[in-house]
A protein has these predicted regions:
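Active-site neighborhoods of enzymes that stabilize oxyanions during catalysis
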Residues: 1-4, 10, 53, 117-207, ...
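Thiolate-centered catalytic microenvironments shared by cysteine-dependent enzyme domains
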Residues: 59-160, 173, 177-178, 254-278
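Hydrophobic alpha-helical membrane-insertion signals
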Residues: 5-33
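Active-site-surrounding "flap" and adjacent substrate/cofactor-binding loops of secreted or lumenal enzymes
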Residues: 37-40, 44
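Short cysteine clusters
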Residues: 249
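Helix-loop module immediately N-terminal to the HCX5R catalytic loop
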Residues: 52-82, 210-245
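Extended hydrophobic/aromatic segments used for targeting, binding, or gating
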Residues: 13, 268-292
Length: 292
């Protein structure tokens, strides 16, 4: 669930509460920014290294259950913990943690600070530079809910009247002028191909996908929109309770926030295509659309 800065301040001393800072930026300064100041008692968790499979051929794929559990345990998280995750407002790392916990059988464990660290500071709460020295937790992965979609699942949505495929990337990536890369967007050439440090990647989108940029999930204050507002947004793109939805982005990060928003709006038959554009754009056998 989403929690407010006021709620977090009132529960900061609860014995089962664990606060995790998932800030990340293209310059790799997440940990340094954490050390400069964070919610008192928060531990730092780097989703881009701690929660991913370092040996997978695709970037940022979800870690296996053992590696994922070890990362949570290093952050002091146990099965009984109430976890509040935050990042910069509008950033999707906390939603990635929420999704991973759901995949591994803890769908209700993660609370997300609505409005991010900006909400905490904006309401007058102090930051701390102290790094807590707390014991490790004990977190048990178990069979989870069906929150993951494959390439085959995405292909199956093409002719399914009861399914919709949603793309959470920014408009330039949906149109195919750039592709996402962790150090910054990379422009595509005249043939619609971007040269990335991991090789060539076609730009564009799955042809039948509908654009729902992650920024539309938030109000002007970068707090997530209400259930009613999200329901109206999703209805406008053909997503509604009783229909299946699959979300994707570049590597499954902003698509995690979109998945969360779908669930918040009561659309339960929803899953994340984790491989995302990093897989789709590299396979010449898969269709791609550009422009629009």
């Amino acid at each position: 669930m989403l929690v407010t800065a006021q709620w977090l301040a009132a529960h900061l001393e609860d014995p089962d509460l664990v606060v995790v800072d998932l800030r990340w930026d293209e310059e790799g300064r997440g940990r340094a920014r954490y050390e400069e100041g964070h919610v008192p008692g928060a531990r730092f968790l780097d989703w881009a290294t701690d929660l991913v499979d370092p040996d997978h051929e695709l970037a940022f794929m979800l870690a296996d259950p053992e590696r994922f559990a070890a990362a949570l345990e290093r952050s002091g998280i146990s099965d009984h913990s109430v976890v509040v995750a935050y990042a910069d407002a509008g950033h999707s790392g906390p939603f990635r943690l929420w999704w991973g916990c759901g995949v591994y059988g803890h769908p209700d464990q993660i609370c997300i600070l609505d409005g991010g660290l900006e909400a905490w500071v904006g309401e007058g709460h102090a930051l701390s530079g102290d790094v807590p020295n707390e014991p490790e937790g004990s977190w048990t992965p178990r069979p989870g809910t069906d929150l993951t979609a494959t390439r085959a699942d995405v292909l199956a949505t093409r002719d399914d009247e009861n399914a919709v495929l949603l793309d959470s990337r920014e408009p330039d990536k949906f149109r195919g002028t750039t592709v996402w890369f962790e150090t910054g967007a990379i422009a595509a050439d005249a043939d619609g191909v971007a040269s990335t440090p991991r090789g060539s990647l076609r730009a564009g989108r799955v042809p039948w996908a509908v654009s729902v940029p992650w920024s539309r999930l938030y109000g002007p204050d970068l707090r997530m929109r209400s259930r009613e507002e999200l329901s109206a947004l999703f209805a406008s793109v053909g997503a509604a309770p009783g229909r299946r939805a699959i979300t994707y982005c570049g590597v499954g990060i902003s698509a995690s926030a979109l998945l969360y928003a779908l669930k918040r709006a009561g659309i339960e038959q929803a899953a994340l295509y984790d491989a995302g554009w990093d897989e789709w754009g590299r396979d010449p056998e898969l269709p791609v659309a550009r422009g629009g």
